[in-house]
């Protein structure tokens, strides 16, 4: 069964309903004023399921109506350590099987357990991912360049070279906070996650350097980093077109990213699974869900998002034409 909610109605109904749940909370889409701007039938759809389970992932993928075909990449984060909050391999296995996917990841630019192809692959082994599917460290032989058509900071993006080998991508993201981006969802998973190690330095420094050794001495203002991520996403989306779906799992909602090997404990209860064909809409829906949650544990996550100017990435991505922040929310039962 589906329940269609738009605008302020979605926020009010879901917030009230979630208050009755002990293990899942959610908020929803844009304001009533936004509803007056665009009819609901012209808005991108974000599907939502409260229960976080393998069956729910299969259901929400099917609801999107876009079948993964050809050589399929499933973009995840394998996480920095076993203390990190990366998605459980057993949670995602049926979906990965359904799309006959390869789990893909790239090396980090800051040291740690995933800084080389060998250690990045070993991390995937250690965290149980190679037991459920093939794993491809996409920058194991270097980077490829994708041009950015509309930019302030990045004339091009540097992605793991194997990215170009895939016909379709499932961007399967753990939605949570992030110590630099404010929050991490579909857009961050693409902008940083598909970037090679050199590309990560390039995006993080807004085009100042592609040398990971020089990253920390060249960090820009938060708002510029947010725009840089948007431009990296533009290059990726221009390349992949409509051969992509976006699924965000909002659980273990720490203020810290899965790249943190010792993240702060989650204070906000799990929200559910969100999915869309629009990356801006699905991330906006997750941000709205955090804000609208009746759970008082949301406060530190909201503060993290705002302090790092996380919502600016959504504004800029929308300006670049990557998606919309107005959406309709369809809850699946």
Predicted feature residues:
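Extended, low-polarity segments enriched in aliphatic/aromatic residues
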Residues: 38-333
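Short, low-complexity, disordered segments immediately C-terminal to signal peptides
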Residues: 21-37
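Hydrophobic helical h-region of N-terminal Sec-dependent signal peptides
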Residues: 9-14
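C-terminal motif of bacterial Sec signal peptides marking the signal peptidase cleavage site
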Residues: 16-19
